[in-house]
Amino acid sequence: MAERENRRGNRRDREEAAPEFADRLVAINRVSKTVKGGKRFGFAALVVVGDQKGRVGFGKGKAKEVPEAIRKATEQAKRQMIRVQLREGRTLHHDIEGRHGAGKVVMRAAPEGTGIIAGGPMRAVFEMLGVKDVVSKSLGSANPYNMIRATIDGLKKEQSPRSVAQRRGKKVADILPKRDEAPAAEAAEA
């Protein structure tokens, strides 16, 4: 049985070589296009893909059949992946705000054991990213496309203390707040 190849190489091997990605179907819509003879119906799928180790992407696909729309969305999501630095491999480094259109998303780092406190499409992004503890709130648009784009926008803005220190020409210890001094300062004020 001969394997089919496309212009970029062996397609089947490439798909089998990337099983480390998990995907989550966020939304599927029935869409219609009005043509001369009536309406043509199709489907639009929104998929989030990630390796649960700090990489995530989303894609949308349209087709006449649901499986084909999901396949197209998954391929687009794999092409549009971004890398996010996670603190201790479980949460964000700092509070972030993301925007897209009328959608606004606020994400906050959370202590260990908090879990993912997020609604709808944001939860799918965090699960595929590998975040274990986060608190988030969606303000404005509840459209899943806008919520995911706003979440990705916020995640792109995240910076690790190491990158901030490197950019400023300082040490990481100078960037991070000192944990021992914070309670002592509060006790001195009281």
Curated annotation (Swiss-Prot):
Residues 21-84 form the S5 DRBM domain. Residues 171-182 have a biased composition (Basic and acidic residues). It comes from the Bacteria. InterPro entries: Ribosomal_Su5_D2-typ_SF, Ribosomal_uS5, Ribosomal_uS5_bac-type, Ribosomal_uS5_C, Ribosomal_uS5_N, Ribosomal_uS5_N_CS, Ribsml_uS5_D2-typ_fold_subgr. GO terms for molecular function: rRNA binding; structural constituent of ribosome. GO terms for biological process: translation. Keywords: Ribonucleoprotein, Ribosomal protein, RNA-binding, rRNA-binding. Residues 156-190 are annotated as: Disordered. One of its GO terms (cellular component) is small ribosomal subunit. Pfam families: Ribosomal_S5, Ribosomal_S5_C. The N-terminal domain interacts with the head of the 30S subunit; the C-terminal domain interacts with the body and contacts protein S4. The interaction surface between S4 and S5 is involved in control of translational fidelity. Belongs to the universal ribosomal protein uS5 family. With S4 and S12 plays an important role in translational accuracy. Part of the 30S ribosomal subunit. Contacts proteins S4 and S8. HAMAP family: Ribosomal_uS5_B. This is Small ribosomal subunit protein uS5. It comes from Ruegeria pomeroyi (strain ATCC 700808 / DSM 15171 / DSS-3) (Silicibacter pomeroyi). The gene is rpsE.
